[in-house]
Amino acid sequence: MKIAIGCDHIVTDEKMAVSDFLKSKGYEVIDCGTYDHTRTHYPIFGKRVGEAVANGLADLGVCICGTGVGITNAVNKVPGIRSALVRDMTTALYAKEELNANVIGFGGKITGELLMCDIIEAFIKAEYKETEENKKLIAKIAHLESHNANQEDPDFFTEFLEKWDRGEYHD
């Protein structure tokens, strides 16, 4: 399995630790940068990770910046990417199993290296639990990637809100 990984200059050391961990587990790592501590901009590296995954060069991706917010937002702008900012195992597993996330993001100054490694390994091993409902939700999310008139409809998500109101979803 190939894992694309990218970061900004703030968390290069953390990225390298995660990369070393993944290699020790037998995964092929595609290092999308950055490679040192020279000031740079996280969107560049989020985009690179996203493109590697979306183009099939990598199976999954990992993005890390200081808080994780910026790089996760950046990678989510790449069509075909479903990324989640995670800080715990439960969130990572939900993202993969229910939403078929293909990239996870971390705040390298918030989440410790060992915890990141544990979460990433669980994320990689988790499997998407395909259901008709999950497929429909993912299709709705993917539909947002391109502009279309339906997105302007204030009732775009009404079907899912009605199911929530009927108690078909739970926290």
Curated annotation (Swiss-Prot):
Gene Ontology biological process: D-allose catabolic process; galactose catabolic process; lactose catabolic process via tagatose-6-phosphate; pentose-phosphate shunt, non-oxidative branch
Stored Pfam families: LacAB_rpiB
Pathway in which the depicted protein is active: Carbohydrate metabolism; D-galactose 6-phosphate degradation; D-tagatose 6-phosphate from D-galactose 6-phosphate: step 1/1
Domain of life: Bacteria
GO MF annotation list: galactose-6-phosphate isomerase activity; ribose-5-phosphate isomerase activity
Cited InterPro entries: LacB (IPR004784), RpiB_LacA_LacB (IPR003500), RpiB_LacA_LacB_sf (IPR036569)
Keywords tagged on the record: Isomerase, Lactose metabolism
Keyword Isomerase in record: yes
Catalysis performed (reactions): aldehydo-D-galactose 6-phosphate = keto-D-tagatose 6-phosphate
EC number: 5.3.1.26
Family as reported in the entry's similarity comment: Belongs to the LacAB/RpiB family.
Subunit description: Heteromultimeric protein consisting of LacA and LacB.
Name under which the protein is recorded: Galactose-6-phosphate isomerase subunit LacB
Organism: Streptococcus equi subsp. zooepidemicus (strain H70)
